[in-house]
């Protein structure tokens, strides 16, 4: 029998215990032996729990038990999770995690440490929750060079944008509903609505795609706080939907760029029809072409099932998994990984008449003008062009309240 430990007994950690028990027979068949949770590390008091005997407040309990071969990390964050995971890997124990912040920040280091100590460091649940993305990418697509990734990887903001579109609802009201349903944090929803969650996820995918560590701090990131009902309606006029897109590009010259930002997505694009809490990631391989991964990006049991799948792989394959699941450390570059490509560009402007926008912003057309506010779609521009347009509008006494690229097919 394989004995494992869980560090952190929140939503996902408790889900891991539930999955291990409910699907014990199928897990044993796939792992080649029964899998049992022997310890749960959590500093809170669970003395009234039916599983009270499993709980410990000390990681040394886990590290001093030679029966523990795999440790599940679902603490979250990096303050405690990172040093605990390091100690587990240094002891030769494999670690399976759903912690996107830790993987995005320390992934290269922890992968190398695992390899050094003949262990596995697995993190399927860190990007797609219960939707498989990491394993297909480093195994099934291993013969492909991935040059482009576009994705909706945050279910909370996608739910909010869907609500805003379907029910003519503002940002604040959509956020309140997302919080009531448990999709967004009540105290600080910033990780979701400001794009930080999506940034960490695209950093992980970009690192896998290019083979070296991509730092989240180098990825330009914007959320959806500035999106209004007027923008939603303008998108519909333009046969598009507004989505928070996490993206990665590698150009022919080897230069890479990445970002997280709201975009106008043409209805002809597969991502435009991804609604509610669903996620989708579109990748372009040089041999396969386009491939799409689609499913719910979060949730207790979907995410826990992905973690347990990693546990099975760690028990069966161990260090062999790292033959393809690996990226190298890299020095942190200065500045941001800016996109230099040309796109149609949506501008919502205040304080400047719509009639002046063609001469200021270049060729394009007015989408709407109402109550001192106007929206204009520039036919083609780079981010540098838009920065220059923004300066011109400010000189005229106006302001660019929102700018978005338009993503075509």
Language model: regions and residue ranges:
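N-terminal glycine-/serine-/threonine-rich beta1-alpha1-beta2 phosphate-ribose binding loop
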Residues: 1-91
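Substrate-binding/catalytic subdomain of NAD(P)-dependent oxidoreductase enzymes
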Residues: 173-273, 278-280
